[in-house]
A protein has these predicted regions:
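Single-stranded nucleic acid-binding surfaces, predominantly the OB-fold ssDNA-binding core
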Residues: 1-95
Length: 95
């Protein structure tokens, strides 16, 4: 999905260590953005190499940006075993 959005807030790049599915240490890199189209507001993250590539980039909150995103529905269970869903928005590109 690509949408014209205003960037309300930008977080610095964060790197978090974790253990991957094969038991190997790995690093998860992300940069968070609070985006609005004037009606809806969402939180989305740029991850991996793309997050690193825009680490020093500044964004003008008064300018609209073409933001290309993908959305992922995540299923999870709470401590009582009830199933819940949440959405993750990942930024692919910001123009």
């Amino acid at each position: 999905m690509e949408k014209l959005m205003f960037i309300s807030k930008v977080s610095p790049v964060e790197e978090r260590n974790y253990t991957d599915r094969n038991g190997q240490p790995a690093v998860f890199t992300s940069r968070g953005f609070l985006l609005t189209d004037g009606i809806d507001t969402i939180y989305a993250e740029a991850t991996g190499d793309y997050a690193k590539s825009i680490a020093s980039r500044t964004f003008d909150p008064a300018s609209a940006h073409a933001v290309q995103m993908s959305f992922i529905a995540r299923e999870w269970k709470d401590k009582d075993g009830a199933t819940h869903y949440s959405n993750d928005a990942r930024i692919i590109r910001i123009a």
